[in-house]
């Protein structure tokens, strides 16, 4: 691989990303189109990137960043649709593609066709999530799409491994595919949790934001490669390592949290731009590979069109089946509640228990609405895993023969990836606007109000403690001023100045104590399950910025 060419591609992709965002366009689609056009410039060489680079270097940080910002609470809350879309749909898509491709292409074995299905099965939620955030999709839809993207890669790559080993005759830990699938999932998750816990312990001893951030950068790569060495799922190892670190992320200092947020945001922009640029640059050469393999180019891309339509059809059918199942379950739940006094009493007792514990009411059997199902069904753009898996197909089998259908699979994979990006990625924003999904602002306000109650209670405890035993240097008027700021949720604390240097230093120390008490109280309630994780995450980030401002002011006085 030419390092200079790689840097040129990265710089060009970043430039196109900046231009697309300035014009209000989707960067992914524009980068692919520009890359495809650039590939026809005379003298532009093929960007030779190994599958190991994409799977081992590009994929882990993208997954880790997404999982780090997606708490285990949100994952478990939407577990049923996430597993349905991330596992069941991947398997169904792979099998459907396998049967259709083997029926269309003469001489294409079913195993090779299912390998093609495993390659094109997993959607990439990067583009969908970016569009959804911009247009304000309901939080539940965003959580389902994000959670699906964390699981489906593992399912697809495990299927890919099983199919490749069956065709190429390579060794796998278990001959039984079900056992191999279970082993990969369980061991991968355990590796991720173990490394995440170890990282949390190390971070407590480091006590330096720079070192803690470096450790965080190393973690996804370590999790991926260690799990892969154990023939487990590196994808799940990365995801569960992120869950473990994210769950304890508030035990580190505010500097580490703020620094890591910017670092992972930069990783996301850089790696996503590279993947889509690589996709566009490779298109012309994929056509050449098909011709070199002496395959009819028209037939190959006709097959690509059929598979593209198939994957775009299977997803809506499955999503609507999930919707129908949820609606039937809700109807059965309502019928049981209306017809059984004992069942109603049990629900009422559970509601009283949750209320006494300060927990929000449980929302039973709330399936996706029809507009939400439409959005989820259309958010099926393929991306990094499809491209990486296609490139990872070996050149030959263990007997030395050429791997059957390699050029065909790669061509169809690129066709599906680019096709879904152009068709679904380009039309998804208009679809969301037209559906006019109801905003979940009311729910967010309710969750924010619960968080505010906890913050005010924590502020009251701190103020009461300072009032009963004021620190030296605190005048009565300063204590009253501090009480007023605490009532305002410390919103103005970062800008507040004391009347003189000594008083100001003491005053800022009180503000730091207040901010930390608020953070600890909110996190304690979140861990009890009484607060919405999204509302808590938003508040924690704001408290971090406020603490950074106050701490910086204190340091400037030294």
PLM regions and their residue ranges:
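Transmembrane helical cores of multi-pass secondary ion antiporters/exchangers
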Residues: 1-446, 461, 469, 526-558
């Amino acid at each position: 691989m030419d390092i200079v060419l790689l840097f040129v591609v990265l710089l060009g992709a970043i430039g196109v990303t900046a231009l697309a965002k300035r014009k209000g366009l989707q960067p992914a689609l524009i980068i692919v189109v520009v890359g495809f056009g650039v590939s026809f410039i005379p003298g532009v060489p093929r960007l030779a990137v190994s599958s190991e680079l994409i799977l081992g270097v590009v994929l882990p940080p993208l997954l880790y960043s997404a999982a780090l910002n997606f708490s285990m609470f949100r994952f478990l809350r939407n577990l049923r649709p996430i597993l349905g879309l991330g596992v069941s749909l991947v398997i169904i898509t792979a099998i459907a593609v396998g049967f259709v491709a083997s029926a269309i292409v003469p001489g294409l074995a079913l195993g090779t066709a299912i390998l093609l299905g495993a390659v094109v099965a997993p959607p990439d939620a990067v583009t969908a999530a970016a569009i959804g955030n911009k247009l304000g999709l309901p939080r539940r839809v965003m959580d389902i799409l994000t959670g699906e993207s964390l699981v489906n890669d593992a399912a697809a790559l495990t299927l890919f491994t099983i199919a490749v080993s069956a065709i190429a005759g390579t060794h796998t830990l278990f001959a039984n595919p079900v056992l191999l699938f279970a082993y990969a999932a369980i061991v991968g998750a355990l590796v991720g949790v173990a490394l995440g816990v170890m990282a949390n312990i190390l971070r407590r001893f480091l006590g330096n934001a720079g070192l803690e951030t470096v450790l965080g950068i190393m973690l996804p790569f370590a999790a991926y490669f260690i799990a892969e060495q154990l023939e487990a799922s590196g994808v799940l190892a990365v995801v569960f390592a992120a869950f473990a670190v994210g769950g304890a992320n508030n035990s580190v200092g505010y500097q580490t949290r703020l620094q890591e947020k910017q670092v992972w945001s930069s990783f996301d922009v850089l790696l996503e731009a590279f993947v889509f640029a690589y996709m566009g640059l490779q298109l012309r050469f994929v056509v050449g590979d098909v011709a070199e393999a002496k395959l009819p180019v028209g037939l190959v891309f006709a097959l690509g069109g059929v598979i593209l339509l198939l994957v775009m059809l299977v997803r809506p059918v499955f999503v609507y089946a999930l919707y129908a199942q949820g609606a039937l379950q809700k109807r059965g739940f309502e019928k049981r509640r209306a017809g059984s006094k004992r069942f109603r009493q049990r629900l009422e007792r559970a509601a009283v228990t949750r209320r006494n514990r300060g927990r929000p009411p449980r929302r039973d059997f709330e399936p996706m609405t029809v507009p939400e199902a439409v959005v989820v069904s259309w958010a099926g753009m393929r991306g990094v895993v499809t491209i990486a898996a296609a490139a990872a197909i070996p050149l030959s089998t263990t007997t030395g023969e050429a791997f059957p259908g390699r050029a065909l699979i790669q061509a169809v994979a690129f066709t599906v990836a680019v096709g879904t990006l152009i068709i679904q990625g380009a039309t998804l924003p208009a679809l969301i606007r037209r559906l006019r999904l109801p905003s979940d602002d009311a729910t967010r306000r309710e969750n924010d109000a619960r968080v505010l109650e906890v913050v005010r209670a924590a502020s009251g405890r701190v103020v009461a403690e300072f009032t009963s035993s004021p620190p030296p240097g605190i005048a009565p008027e300063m204590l009253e001023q501090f009480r007023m700021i605490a009532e305002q949720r410390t919103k103005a604390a970062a800008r507040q100045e004391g009347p003189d240097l000594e008083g100001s230093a003491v005053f800022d120390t009180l503000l730091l104590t207040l901010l930390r008490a608020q953070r600890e109280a909110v996190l304690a309630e979140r861990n009890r399950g009484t607060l919405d994780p999204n509302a808590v995450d938003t508040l924690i980030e704001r408290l971090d910025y406020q603490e950074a401002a106050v701490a910086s002011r204190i340091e400037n006085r030294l």
